[in-house]
């Protein structure tokens, strides 16, 4: 972009505003402002420049369209159902390893570690820390139910990663990830004294925190030996790595954190710049990390200028039989006087001096047997791996340096090109059954011809032995009756990631068909004749009459040892006639076919065992599912029977209480009747008698009253009769008086 001089450059207000917006957006997001805002600022800037020619012209290049991004790389989700256990705040929690990350059972955490906190508090902290909890699959839920971790009525279960569980527990149990700073006036009084053995450390987990480590205080795994330089509080190492005061993260995806791996997270402070001081403090830190490391998870870094003994031994075993022969492109083996087979010497230009002194240790002797190019390879790999840029330092969430992977990719250029097919495998894969095939790729201009593994023991070097004490070299490959295979070696694609054992199995199966064609006498005779007529053939060695005896003397041995012994005796005796060579070739082919038959039988047995194991696994899974279903049904039936039993027991208790109450009432009534029946009857009868007496008295009184009334009426009648008689006597005569008196008397009687 072309601009005017810096002193006279004045950015346009629109451009300045865009830059400010970009600066603010880039601090809180991964992208920045949208593309149209920058394009709008550019167009407005051009328009303003066209209107005002006095301002300096700033030519902005046209914005290139964004490159087409490749499609997403789809991978099947990891639905692991292998249950394991982990320790969280002293509690054992069940978990599943999904994608390399432990996912813990959330209900188990809530009921054990966080049982003193409410769901509202936990949800608020999860929102603050941007913690997301996933749901377990049906298989995982079934396993948790079968193991008794969840009840069978649980519809689902949440899973939380080990990293988020550490953050959540630290925020709730220890006052949050970002505790407040202590007052500065008290910081000087509680600050630890800086001694020769104490030094500053830091970590970059969930933000950055610096502390002062005092190794003397690290007396047990939970001892508080690190003081935070901000709050001056003491923490044990596994709590210090989750302690922080600065929110340096913005929606960071945390993965793979485990406070038990604090030895990888705590680093030496960058304030120490002196080489000697840094080395001394680094050694103290390593010694402190090695204390109480019962699982031996922490391993001290090896110096960059040399390899550890374990790495040297592993490299020695890996390249023990793999050396490059520029003449024929195949690996060669030699038999030492002690009976051990070792690779032959490399070319003279790369040959190293070998000290055969008996005073050397076995490790040094084995190290001297390595070729010069192998040593240069190891040294170059050490340099490439050990050379790490200071800016690419290890961190809690950046434990690998980009330089390591890049140098490891360049490591293959130092090695001879290996044949990327099934003819190369580890010498440990079938060391009890077959000979190790360590064939290397020949130069590009030569035709690739694969020989049987039995022919790889023959050296193409024609150098004579230097002394009688040294093992004599094998003859040139052209002298040996090695069977050339007409089929070229099949190279496998580079993306083939199968194991070495499976690769060797495929090669053996393909090689069996070629060996069957080699077993015919016509082919062996023609091939041996071709070998006899080849140029550069040396004078044949006189045949030994003891060849047949030597060829069959080791018939009792089997496998690799018998084959190697047979070849050694045959080559030591020498072959001079065509018949002897053909006979030797027939023996080799017969032995190889027999060995292949044994290998095929072993592979078939292994395949059948694998199938049976898979069948048993499926059957076991099916039985487990059936048992789980039966257990669930049985539990449901037990729950139903328990509910019915409880209901019946409740009804029986209620009826028992009611009957008991009625019985008590009846008993009270019966007791009262027995004690009060006579008195009640007596009182009843007395009352009746009194009533009758009262009634009798009333009747007597009424009778007396009636008698008195009757007496009064009689007296009144008598008086009336007198009065009437007197009146009759006075008024009427005597006759009439008689008749009237009679009538009156009759009326009175009536």
UniProtKB/Swiss-Prot annotation:
Coiled coil, from the record: 558-732
A Gene Ontology biological process term: negative regulation of BMP signaling pathway
CDD domains cross-referenced by the UniProt entry: DHD_Ski
Localization of this protein: Nucleus
Composition skew (Acidic residues), residue ranges: 493-504
UniProt GO MF annotations: DNA-binding transcription factor activity, RNA polymerase II-specific; DNA-binding transcription factor binding; protein domain specific binding; protein homodimerization activity; RNA polymerase II cis-regulatory region sequence-specific DNA binding; sequence-specific DNA binding; SMAD binding
UniProt xrefs under Gene3D superfamilies: SAND domain-like (3.10.390.10), Ski (3.10.260.20)
Function: May play a role in terminal differentiation of skeletal muscle cells but not in the determination of cells to the myogenic lineage. May function in TGF-beta signaling.
Protein name in UniProt: Ski oncogene
Gene source species: Gallus gallus
